[in-house]
């Protein structure tokens, strides 16, 4: 535990996981070649609400890219091919949002679309391309002064292509829904959620269909101005419906098949004005981690 990655035997690769056993280090070897680096960011925002008679609409378009390679061109940045030999890395991300609200902030609805392509060419054995797209809607409606009803639905596609290890190639697509009720009191905050989703796709030549349903509670209790304690409890049950015993890590939001239980608690408290204490206790139980406990704490002194 407490690493950055875990090894997936089915895919023959390391998967990013905050509970994994492996820590990643970068060790340069071999000859060094001259690379051209280019980074860029574009942000466009049009807020109709600032006009005198404008509607309650705000539109955002964001783009950022990061490129390294011996050759720079439009196609290398926007649409790199898997067989490219002149690219070290090419990452592109686009985000579009349309935000609809009301003047009294009693409701809000947001439509969003995001897509990214991450070309990774720093493995001497070959290249990989990680593609991702997500389109959805979320928002909230005020029920009372201290309570809101929140919702989100989205459809996503995740695609991994590799030209040197066939087992790594996989594709996942599906949709997820979540509805939440939030209650905000003077000394506490609470949120109750129900979520459901279905993912399907393939791993190399094997197809799968998986579904999951779960509940979540997130709460925070304040001790005046001295500190607070937070609790997050997540319980879900996931099933594979096509008699395939394995699902890729991109499916079911990274959870495993079967029952998944996750509990996270954290405490922050000021003992004195210049001394504070923080502690977190985490518990995880699923097919991948059996009754995993992690405890961390620290004292801080402020000069």
Spans of model-derived segments:
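Exposed, low-structure sequence patches enriched in small/polar residues
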Residues: 1-303
């Amino acid at each position: 535990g407490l690493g950055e990655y875990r090894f997936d035997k089915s895919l023959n690769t390391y998967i990013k996981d905050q509970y994994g056993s492996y820590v990643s280090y970068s060790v340069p070897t071999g000859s060094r070649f001259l690379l051209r680096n280019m980074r860029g960011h574009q942000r466009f925002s049009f807020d109709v609400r600032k006009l005198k008679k404008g509607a309650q609409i705000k539109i955002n378009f964001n783009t950022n890219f990061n490129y390294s390679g011996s050759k720079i061109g439009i196609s290398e940045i926007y649409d790199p091919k898997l067989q490219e030999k002149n690219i070290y890395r090419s990452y592109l991300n686009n985000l579009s949002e349309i935000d609809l609200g009301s003047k009294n902030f009693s409701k809000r609805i947001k439509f969003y679309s995001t897509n990214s392509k991450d070309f990774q060419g720093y493995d001497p054995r070959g290249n990989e391309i990680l593609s991702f797209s997500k389109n959805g809607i979320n928002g909230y409606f005020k029920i009372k002064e201290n309570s809101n009803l929140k919702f989100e639905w989205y459809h996503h596609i995740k695609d991994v292509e590799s030209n040197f290890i066939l087992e790594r190639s996989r594709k996942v697509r599906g949709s997820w829904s979540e509805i939440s009720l939030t209650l905000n009191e003077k000394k506490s905050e609470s949120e109750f959620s129900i979520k459901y989703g279905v993912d399907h796709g393939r791993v190399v030549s094997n197809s799968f269909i998986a579904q999951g349903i779960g509940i979540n509670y997130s709460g925070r209790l304040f001790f005046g101005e001295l500190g607070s304690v937070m609790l997050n409890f997540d319980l879900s049950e996931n099933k594979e419906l096509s008699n395939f015993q394995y699902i890729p890590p991109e499916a079911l939001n990274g959870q495993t098949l079967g029952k998944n239980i996750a509990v996270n608690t954290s405490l922050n408290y000021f003992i004195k004005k210049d001394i504070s204490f923080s502690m977190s206790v985490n518990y995880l139980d699923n097919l991948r981690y059996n009754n995993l406990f992690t405890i961390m704490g620290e004292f801080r002194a402020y000069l």
